[in-house]
């Protein structure tokens, strides 16, 4: 594979056109796992082609799930196991830096298997720095047999398939909604009903709504008591819906919508007003900043206007929120993004990384423990910079928008976008209009 060390983006006069989004990473990996656990065969369409989805597919295959993947990898026919997965004792699964694989699999692999076996879940160095203790603590309350192999609270994990009893479980929701998602997805397969109580403030609630909607699509209804507790009936089997279409990735939509709000007009296809993804709300934040936004059943359109800074809590859309930090540079007044501590436990510490890279461009930035304050720049005041991407796909993509200033920008390691959007830069370039 050819490695591209950097990509230089020269100033872009205008952005204009249409883009059709690749499938959502979060939906793709949830759909594959639910299909694997379900009774029946599921055809998953508009699957995202990316590193993270490949990690899920490889793991499921190793765990005995049969599937047929189309030549373009966008459609997968999954034969469900109707319950616990099976593997040879001593198995080790390498899951890269894919949180949407590590967290739910850690829960599912605790289920009682016909043959007792142990599995090790491991990943890249960064994965071993991403906390998982809140999930492990909750699973242990339900009877799980999980051990940390290196650092307490972090992968790699050793898991034995001795079963999940269920019962009353407390889980801390303050760091990542993926922990609750993992627990919810496995709860119907536990031995007794599960009452899940949330400790602390639950972050990224729209991602929980997405999980609950998908569980409904696969035949399981969860009782949600105002996000304070959840009740799940045990000894169920997910039921295949036959076909599951994966919506376009709302987080990936943010770059194109933001580009249009700064300098043009773009119609983003593949996600619309009825999307189950919380990151669709990114468009509402742009609208509050002054962008012209219009919605359809299967599209969102953004058009340039005068942008104002904003003081906003973006806890509910943490992945799309970092794009607002770039839009802030093009606004007329300062922007404060609040309640985003969980940026620090993403693919990199995004609060620190964003502050560092924004300052390279000449921006005045204040980095707090859970907020970032950004002063705007005139189009002519951006400094030429090489942007370090920290092996974080979202940093690479959002900093591409700096080319909408009067200054070129260089993105290091642009291929890190393989995690969710391998051909992002090619798609972005199709919308460029230059003098």
From Swiss-Prot:
Pathway field: Metabolic intermediate biosynthesis; chorismate biosynthesis; chorismate from D-erythrose 4-phosphate and phosphoenolpyruvate: step 6/7
Residues annotated as binding 3-phosphoshikimate: 25-26, 30, 176-178, 204, 319, 342, 346
Listed PROSITE patterns: EPSP_SYNTHASE_1 (PS00104), EPSP_SYNTHASE_2 (PS00885)
Broad enzyme group: transferase
Catalytic reaction annotation: 3-phosphoshikimate + phosphoenolpyruvate = 5-O-(1-carboxyvinyl)-3-phosphoshikimate + phosphate
Residue ranges the record marks as coiled coil: none
GO molecular function, one term: 3-phosphoshikimate 1-carboxyvinyltransferase activity
Residues forming the catalytic site: 319 (proton acceptor)
Record-linked InterPro entries: Enolpyruvate_Tfrase_dom, Enolpyruvate_Tfrase_sf, EPSP_synthase, EPSP_synthase_CS, RNA3'P_cycl/enolpyr_Trfase_a/b
EC number assigned by the record: 2.5.1.19
Compartments, as annotated in UniProt: Cytoplasm
Binding sites annotated in the UniProt record for phosphoenolpyruvate: 25, 99, 130, 178, 350, 394, 419
Sorted UniProt keywords: Amino-acid biosynthesis, Aromatic amino acid biosynthesis, Cytoplasm, Transferase
Family affiliation: Belongs to the EPSP synthase family.
Function: Catalyzes the transfer of the enolpyruvyl moiety of phosphoenolpyruvate (PEP) to the 5-hydroxyl of shikimate-3-phosphate (S3P) to produce enolpyruvyl shikimate-3-phosphate and inorganic phosphate.
Subunit record text: Monomer.
NCBIfam families associated with the record: aroA
Protein name in UniProt: 3-phosphoshikimate 1-carboxyvinyltransferase
Protein's organism: Haemophilus ducreyi (strain 35000HP / ATCC 700724)
Gene designation: aroA
